[in-house]
Every structure is written in structure tokens, then in C-alpha cells.
């Protein structure tokens, strides 16, 4: 079964989901979430604080162990609002690469919305008809 890992570095928390494709459906193998408050200082000062960076790196290292344990074939790491706005985002993405080997993809707000929509309509029962989707993200 092909196994995939998705990591979301958000403004308030980091999330990990590892899933395998089985009979044309995703089967969740592992999930994790850590509140890191990456965006808290960004929205006040324009930069990611050293404390938020360290908290996020700790979470990502834990996620990395889970990804290795589940032998994910593909890993996608995305970052959202706080990373789009932070003046020191590039330095932080280098730290992530150094700590985990992962490249962080800082996605646009439009791509973020597209991915949220795709996740809801492909996994939520009843989401294929008319519905309203509201993203209450941290950024």
C-alpha cells in the first residue's frame, strides 16, 4: 500500500497525518498535532520568535520519527499564513531542512483554501451536495 504523510505548519499548530491508500481509499495510520504558536510573534513583530521556532522544530522532529516508522513513500510539508508573512521564514525553512531533511512549501492563501476544500469534499459524508465551508485558521 502506498503511504503518504502530510504536514501542515500552521500559525497556531503543526499537524501530521500519515495515511495509506487501500482499495482506492485513504486509511489513516497515524495523526499528531502540537500547538506551537508560530504566528503569535509574526503577527506582532513580523518575525518568528526563537521560542516558536524551537517549539515547531521539536514537533517536526517528533513527526519525522513517526514518518520514518510508517515508511512514508511521499511527504509533503506545507506552511501557511505565518510563514507567508514572516520576514525570517527563509531562515526557518533552512532550519527545518537541516533538522528533518524536509523542504517546506510555503503555500498561497488560495492553495491553502483549495487543499482544505479538497480534504473536506473527499472525506466528509454529505459534503458532496450544497454546503458552506468556513476556514477558522489561526492566521
What do these predicted regions represent?
Residues 12-14, 139:
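Conserved Rossmann-like nucleotide-cofactor binding loop
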Residues 1-9, 17-134:
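Nucleotide/phosphate-binding catalytic cleft detector across ATP-hydrolyzing
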Amino acid at each position: 500500500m502506498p503511504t503518504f504523510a502530510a504536514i501542515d505548519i500552521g500559525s497556531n499548530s503543526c499537524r501530521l497525518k500519515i495515511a495509506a491508500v487501500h482499495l482506492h481509499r485513504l486509511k489513516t495510520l497515524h495523526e499528531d498535532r502540537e500547538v506551537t504558536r508560530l504566528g503569535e510573534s509574526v503577527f506582532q513583530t513580523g518575525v518568528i520568535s526563537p521560542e516558536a521556532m524551537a517549539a515547531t522544530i521539536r514537533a517536526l522532529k517528533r513527526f519525522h520519527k513517526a514518518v520514518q516508522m510508517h515508511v512514508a513513500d511521499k511527504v509533503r510539508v506545507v506552511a501557511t499564513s505565518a510563514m507567508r508573512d514572516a520576514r525570517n521564514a527563509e531562515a526557518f525553512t533552512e532550519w527545518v531542512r537541516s533538522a528533518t531533511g524536509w523542504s517546506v512549501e510555503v503555500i498561497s492563501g488560495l492553495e491553502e483554501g483549495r487543499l482544505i476544500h479538497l480534504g473536506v469534499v473527499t472525506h466528509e459524508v454529505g459534503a458532496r451536495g450544497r454546503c458552506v465551508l468556513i476556514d477558522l485558521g489561526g492566521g
